[in-house]
């Protein structure tokens, strides 16, 4: 049953994540800075999630070590991944970029095998080969290949793979997943807020369409 739930949640996650480019692309076309998009996206998601958890009376307290680990996960993992993925949208079709991003399970499998000596079954090895072939086919176009876009999306794959692998082997694995997700979103939003303000790229946007897209 737990394995079935895991597969179901993974499928739902992939399906909803695949919708992100539909809304991010419109904001990019409207000339909104990447940093502003990420502040609104993760800020709104984090605040809504926090309200939901408080309504459920979840324990939101973190130890000092957990604060350090969560902030690193938010900035160094989730945050950097979002940065690379958003920039890839500027150089290649958003649907293709997001599809290539889902190559990250291969990165996770390889990291776990190399650094944690986990055994890769034959079917996993076959899946890795098929995934590599899929990335090649998605990246190939009849014209000029947008190498910079491919670089950005592959970097998003690597950083997110490292993020997932690190979660499996850190103190964060013992945290409630809902609380962990909430704080990762909030720390990511805070990181991009500081970055956007420092670079003069923070925009106060009240257009209903933009806010709806971010939600």
Q: Where on the chain are the PLM-derived regions?
A:
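Specific alpha-helical transmembrane segments that line the substrate/conduction pathway
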Residues: 36-47, 85-119, 156
């Amino acid at each position: 049953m737990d394995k079935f739930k895991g597969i179901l949640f993974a499928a739902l996650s992939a399906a909803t994540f695949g919708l992100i480019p539909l809304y991010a692309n419109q904001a990019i076309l409207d000339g909104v800075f990447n940093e502003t998009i990420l502040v609104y996206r993760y800020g709104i998601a984090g605040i809504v999630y926090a309200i939901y958890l408080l309504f459920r009376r979840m324990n939101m307290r973190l130890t000092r070590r957990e604060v350090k680990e969560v902030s690193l996960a938010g900035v160094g993992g989730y945050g950097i991944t979002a940065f690379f993925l958003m920039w890839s949208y500027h150089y290649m079709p958003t649907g293709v970029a997001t599809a290539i991003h889902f190559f990250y399970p291969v990165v996770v499998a390889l990291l776990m095998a190399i650094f944690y000596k986990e055994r890769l079954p034959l079917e996993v090895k076959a899946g890795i080969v098929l995934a590599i072939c899929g990335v090649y086919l998605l990246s190939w176009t009849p014209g000029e290949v947008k190498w910079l876009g491919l670089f950005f999306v592959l970097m998003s794959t690597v950083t997110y793979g490292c993020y997932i692998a690190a979660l499996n082997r850190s103190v964060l694995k013992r945290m409630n997943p809902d609380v962990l997700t909430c704080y990762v979103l909030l720390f990511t939003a805070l990181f991009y807020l500081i970055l956007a303000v420092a670079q003069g790229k923070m925009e106060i946007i009240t257009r209903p369409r933009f806010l709806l897209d971010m939600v």
